[in-house]
Amino acid sequence: MFRHVVLFRVRDDVTDPDLSAAIDELRAVGDALGVTSWRVGLSLDKRKGRVVFEDGTFADRVAFEAWRAGEPHRRVAQHMETLADWLVGDWEH
C-alpha cells in the first residue's frame, strides 16, 4: 500500500465558490485505477486559515506514480497552484 496526504493552505483571496469548485476537482481526481481510498475535505480547524486535506491510498507505489503522471492529476495540480500552497506526505506501508 502507498499513502499520499496533502494539506493545501488556501490563499486568503480565494473566493468560497472557487474553493468549492477546486474541492470538487480534487475529489474527482481520486476516481482512478489503483486508488483504493480517497478523501478530500475542508479542515474543521480554521485557526491557520482555510486548509483542504487530500488523503489517498493506492494499491502500491507503481499505481501512485502512474496516477501522479496522469493528465487529470497534472491538470488539478496546475489549478491548485493558483489557489494554495501545500505540504505533501507520501509513504509506503
Residue ranges and their predicted role:
Residues 68, 77-80:
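Short, flexible helix/strand-to-coil boundary loops that buttress conserved ligand/catalytic motifs
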Residues 1-52, 59-69, 85, 89-93:
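Short S/T/G/P-rich N-terminal loop/turn motif that feeds into the first structured element of a domain
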